Amino acid sequence: MSLITRLLTGNNHLRIRALESLGKAGYSSHAKFSEHKPIERIRNIGISAHIDSGKTTLTERILFYTGRIAEMHEVRGKDNVGATMDSMELERQRGITIQSAATYTLWKDTNINIIDTPGHVDFTVEVERALRVLDGAVLVLCAVGGVQSQTLTVNRQMKRYNVPCLAFINKLDRLGSNPYRVLSQMRSKMNHNAAFIQLPIGVESNCKGIVDLVREKAIYFEGEHGMDIRLDEIPQDMRVESLERRQELIEHLSNADETLGELFLEEKPFTEDDIKAALRRTCINRTFTPVLVGTALKNKGVQPLLDAVLDYLPNPGEVENLGFIEKEGQDPEKIVLNPARDGKDPFVGLAFKLEAGRFGQLTYLRCYQGVLRKGDNIFNARTNKKVRIARLVRLHSNQMEDVNEVYAGDIFALFGVDCASGDTFTTNPKNNLSMESIFVPEPVVSMAIKPNNTKDRDNFSKAIARFTKEDPTFHFFFDNDVKETLVSGMGELHLEIYAQRMEREYGCPVTLGKPKVAFRETLVGPCEFDYLHKKQSGGSGQYARIIGIMEPLPPTQNTLLEFVDETVGTNVPKQFVPGVEKGYREMAEKGMLSGHKLSGIRFRLQDGGHHIVDSSELAFMLAAHGAIKEVFQNGSWQILEPIMLVEVTAPEEFQGAVMGHLSKRHGIITGTEGTEGWFTVYAEVPLNDMFGYAGELRSSTQGKGEFTMEYSRYSPCLPDVQDQIVRQYQESQGLAQPDKKKKKN
């Protein structure tokens, strides 16, 4: 059904008005949305922020004003419909966004692809993926909360991928909103060279409109849903302030932009176009952040934000995307991908998200170079598998529209492609080209999981297979010793959400056990081995001898395992070396000290011996097993634990209590800062000591404190913690020895 038909079903005032505005914009039907634009008329943007800053509401308003949806719904609205972008039932219930839905829309004849990203720290891999494929972003800040912990995380990720951004201070209508404080936090906490390009006309309940400092006009949003925009002179009582703020904007811009700086020094007058051009240049170079204001819920400031996206954020042709050509024994060669939409260069695309929906597996891709048409063949650069394109679709949250071709800069989806997120697709498998893969953190928490009813086993395995494919930070394995299935992820909330999705989407209620920490075992110092595996009792025997050293890797590499073949000559024939490595990696899955994986170890195979008949790969594999057991007996071992970066924010009067609790949990406080009655503590705390902290923090700060944590590194745990872990493991294995030593008086 075309947009026009949908608007005509029902005669309410709003739909007629929307129809008129669409008529003015010249939209005739969905055909307008799916036609291809020149590269200057395309924007790929993400909307990311801290939890509850109003990202999804803002996206909903953008879709409404651009004529993409005919009516608006609130995230936690009374009509229980939920926002368009929150398409998962669980998201609508909790009012948080878990998966980034991709949508495209049209504003002033420019095609905007929007990716709505989650703001919760447990879902950072979603944000990482979204930022990887964007050209620009809108950072949404709450006018009350300001720069919060997750805002800083998102800011770090934007820096990692060099994403230019605009800042939008939302929720001006909330009690206690203070956009000026938020701006000073952006400068102090995030080190942004930022300044207002708009000012609010009144805050809290008397928020009337905004002042545009570039055009020196006041903007009012009138009519139902703020669809009519009225420009007026700046109110008398705000003229002095807006002049001062405009001067401040020009000074900040002049520091970052040479062209404007010269005009500033020569004291020449500035035109509106000079400022706009300087804003665009500095924003794309990430040397200045324009700050806009508004309130999405009360429909103020959204249309000027859309204008700013077109004016200041880059199109796909202005962003440099690199591909890497792998060459054996050399560093990969970097090449710049050509973003032109002419289809002359071969197709290159990156899969950034997988979803298993009701239509089978859906893979979201971004096209970086060339053109892709229905019926083409493409190759997965990692597996070299060929894929034939049967259907190409563009996404609008969870509805889709078929297209016949996509060009560089487009975001689209394919069906039934077997791949992992971060895979590169090309038309020529021989050029060994790949985009750099997306950075994925290691999981830090694991929990036992089991379906409540045995009859749900099939659905349970379907759900697990789908979630592990979609989310590289979600792992699943079966522990043979305790006969438990374990899932591991980035935090307790991460795993709880998956447990609830199993119940809701697959009708399979599950029980989660107590959280367990992913410890690791490593060597303290180098240890030599010389092991002979010999079994020659008749028939074909087994014979293998290996000599070498196992040694610890430096602390920065303590999550890796290395195998080095240093053999010379034919004492250990080369065809048997993989057997030794295989045996080493098998034994590394489970240490003998506490049953956790080994890490941070280098296995150096230096020499050995073989038998002309009885040696085999299996014999050398078993020899590696024996050598590692020997090193367990002779070497000294220690246990590593994950250390988390924890950040706690609470009112000043609770500072003593909060710092006391962190010290009690073996935390090392790395820094503190305070602003206007609130303080923030940064600490490094072992994950093992962080369970149950949320409840303790709430009770000790009267519910006002909040904290976030993210994985930092592995480091050796305290001796008493190590003794306790070893003792628990030995008891569970039935190896505990009674203590025979008597105390002497």
Curated annotation (Swiss-Prot):
GTP binds at residues 49-56, 116-120, 170-173. It comes from the Eukaryota. InterPro entries: EFG_II (IPR041095), EFG_III (IPR009022), EFG_III/V (IPR035647), EFG_IV (IPR047872), EFG_V (IPR035649), EFG_V-like (IPR000640), EFTu-like_2 (IPR004161), G_TR_CS (IPR031157). Keywords: Elongation factor, GTP-binding, Mitochondrion, Nucleotide-binding, Protein biosynthesis. It is found in: Mitochondrion. SMART domains: EFG_C, EFG_IV. Pfam families: EFG_C, EFG_III, EFG_IV, GTP_EFTU, GTP_EFTU_D2. GO terms for biological process: mitochondrial translational elongation. One of its GO terms (cellular component) is mitochondrion. Residues 40-317 form the tr-type G domain. PANTHER family: ELONGATION FACTOR G, MITOCHONDRIAL. This protein may be expected to contain an N-terminal transit peptide but none has been predicted. This is Elongation factor G, mitochondrial. The lineage of its organism: Eukaryota, Metazoa, Ecdysozoa, Arthropoda, Hexapoda. The gene is mEFG1.
